Amino acid sequence: MKKIRVIIIASLLLIAIAIAVVCVTRKTTLLDDMLYANEPDIENSITIKAKEIHTYMEENHYGYCTYDNRCNHDGNCGLNATFELSKTGYHNTCCATYVSWVLQEAGYLTKQEHIDNYLNGANNLIRYLTKKGWKEINKKDIQPGDILCYNGHIAIYGGRGRQYDAGSKEYVNKEAPCKISWGMNTEKILRAPDL
């Protein structure tokens, strides 16, 4: 009889903990939604190009591929140095390639910088932008066009708690900007020197 009581009490405690976690998570999501709901829509060259390129990738069914040749579609992998080359070459991207294309189209990077610095890798791109003078900013000061830097991942802040992301085939083919998963915990946020 005591074992049954202990099991019941333990089960009730686990249920209470699960409910508390759901409530806290939901409250955080609601607070984030409320925080960003009044954020002004700011368009700049980065967000304009992020939307334009992401829409093109969605409409043309781009695949996801990483610089180390891992693919999740038909096994043919290739990443182009520029967005224009991707239109007639491989229809693949990864998070860093997408961000690099956006920054090239917005005038912040060149094709040669992309090639010379191997910017198809998120961590390489993050290091290069930092070296190039992009400013690290606090999360509370985030603005559309800022670069969200995670460990091994990179995205573009689109405003109102949303991001332009190409970190998986799902995100390449998902309407953008999509809701940010702050649970990934950005390591840093970078802003272009002139924004």
Give the residues covered by each predicted segment.
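N-terminal capping segments
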Residues: K27-Q112
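Hydrophobic alpha-helical membrane-insertion segments, chiefly the h-region
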Residues: I15-V24
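N-terminal Sec-pathway targeting helices
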Residues: M1-L14
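Structural motif
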Residues: G145-D146
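Short, basic/aromatic beta-hairpin or loop at an interaction surface
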Residues: Y108-L129, I156-G161
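Aromatic- and glycine-rich peptidoglycan recognition patches
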Residues: C23, K27-N38, I48, E59, ...
